Amino acid sequence: MKHIVNFLCKRNMLALLVTFFCAGVSTHLYLDWTKSPVKRALEVPFLDLNGNLVEVGDWPADILVLNFWATWCPPCLKEIPLLVEFQKEHPPKKLQVLGIGIDSELKLREFTLGNKVNYPVLIGKSAGIDMAYELGNFSGGLPFTVVIKNKEQIVKQIEGE
């Protein structure tokens, strides 16, 4: 009899835990999916190359140019001088280029210092890959650039060179 009571208690406890877990997951999914992909992307936290935790939405520019890249990607490296020049031509209050590196912190730091990158570079890791997918990079290729206007609307997506 004692074994039956223990079994029923464990079964009820397991059912209760599963219920709470499912309620939590469904609430989390509901909260996430009530926002647009752009709004969700702007809230993703990344480390910058100075070790600060930042979100893409922290930059006040009217236009954000998000460039997903890696140091091992030759087409990515060809784009970077163009992005550096593009940032020089536009004030950061109006337009901000943000590099989201899908690479190690050390490689990103070495590359940006050696190539005089004049815009912020964030350490993307798997969150960067997820964000790129969320913003339309369904193939997973690099480089991938997204232009976001007023933190609300994707106005351009560019895959590859």
Predicted regions and their residues:
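N-terminal targeting signals for export/organelle localization
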Residues: M1-L47
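A short beta-strand-turn-helix
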Residues: E43-L64, A132
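Short active-site neighborhood of thiol/selenol oxidoreductases, capturing the structured segment around
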Residues: E55-P74, L83
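Active-site acidic short loop of glycosyltransferases
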Residues: W59-D62, P92, N118, G140
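Hydrophobic beta-strand anchors of alpha/beta hydrolase catalytic cores
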Residues: V65-L66, V97, T145
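Structural microenvironment flanking redox-active thiols in thiol-disulfide oxidoreductases
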Residues: K78-K116, S126-Y133
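Thiol/disulfide oxidoreductase modules built on the thioredoxin-like
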Residues: L113-N118, G124-E161
